Structure formats: structure tokens, C-alpha cells
């Protein structure tokens, strides 16, 4: 039996993933307050927001303001989801400590979520990862639908392996 790790890192994604689909607007001040409170809990990584187009995800249209307004704790990494190069530039300007990029192991989900194919999503994140590596900014890779897709059902494990390998080859070590 292999040895268990001595520590793990939990990334709190509530300020981004938990708030992005809320039907009622959440004020920038409330988001900042939530992140500041989470920063005092002992968490070491908080996904603060996403630098996405406001038409697609209106709840996160204030990502720049949220990053500017939080009280940074030196023991916490404040990360952001970036779906494209424009998002990367905004995250870098806002001072995100790390970024997250994404793909999905389902063509249908990928089309509906990122408006491109699996291969298109991989090619879209490649230059972002290159920029991040050059700037020494950590990158986490997300793969949605690794078990099942709400549109296609069970996921093909070979697709998950393919995306994982592509991400590893780019230099992403946290998937």
C-alpha cells in the first residue's frame, strides 16, 4: 500500500463556482466580505472569481473590483478562472496568485460551456498556460464531466486521459 500524503490543499471555489449561477445579483461588497471571512478560516487557496465575459456570467462581471477590494492574507493564494487570453490579461493585472483553465471530457458540454470543441478548448488554453509559466504563475487545470455528462451520459475514460495528458504536456501539474 502506498504512503498517504502528509498534507493536502483544499481550494475553496465558493466565491466563483458557488456564486456564478445565483439568480439574484450579489453585491461586490458582499463577495469581498465573503472572501475576507474565508481568508480568516485557515484556508490556503480561494478561487476568488473568474475573468469571463459579463454577458455569459453576469454574477462575475465585477471580478476586477473584487480582487481590488479584498484584504489579502499572506497565507492564502487568491486564484481566478480564466477561459481565454483576455481573461488571463485581466487576472494578471488584478494580481491573481494562480489561475485555473478548463476543458470538458464531453463535446456537448464543452460546446455549451465554452462554445468550442474539446480540441478547441485545449488550443485556447495553451497560450494562457505558456504565459503563466513564463510569468511563474501557477496553473490549475479543470476537466468537467470526468465521470458523466448531463447531456451525453457516461464519459469515455480515454477522453479524460487525452485531456489530462494534453494539460500535463503544457506544464499544468495540478489537475
What name fits each language-model region?
Residues 11-32, 76-85, 112-117, 145-158:
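Active-site mouth loops of central-metabolism enzymes
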Residues 56-80, 119-144, 162-166:
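Alpha-helix-loop-beta-strand connector modules within alpha/beta enzyme cores
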Amino acid at each position: 500500500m502506498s504512503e498517504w500524503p502528509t498534507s493536502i490543499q483544499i481550494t475553496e471555489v465558493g466565491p466563483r463556482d458557488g456564486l456564478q449561477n445565483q439568480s439574484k445579483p450579489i453585491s461586490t461588497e458582499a463577495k469581498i466580505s465573503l472572501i475576507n471571512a474565508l481568508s480568516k478560516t485557515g484556508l490556503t487557496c480561494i478561487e476568488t472569481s473568474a475573468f469571463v465575459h459579463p454577458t455569459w456570467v453576469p454574477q462575475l462581471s465585477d471580478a476586477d473590483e473584487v480582487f481590488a477590494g479584498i484584504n489579502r492574507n499572506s497565507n492564502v493564494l487568491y486564484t481566478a478562472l480564466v477561459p481565454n487570453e483576455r481573461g488571463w490579461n485581466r487576472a494578471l493585472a488584478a494580481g491573481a496568485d494562480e489561475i485555473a483553465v478548463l476543458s470538458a471530457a464531453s463535446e456537448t458540454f464543452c460546446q455549451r460551456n465554452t462554445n468550442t470543441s474539446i480540441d478547441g478548448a485545449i488550443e485556447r488554453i495553451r497560450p494562457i498556460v505558456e504565459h503563466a509559466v513564463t510569468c511563474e504563475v501557477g496553473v490549475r487545470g479543470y476537466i468537467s464531466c470526468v465521470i458523466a455528462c448531463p447531456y451525453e451520459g457516461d464519459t469515455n475514460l480515454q477522453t479524460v486521459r487525452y485531456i489530462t495528458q494534453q494539460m500535463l504536456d503544457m506544464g499544468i501539474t495540478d489537475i
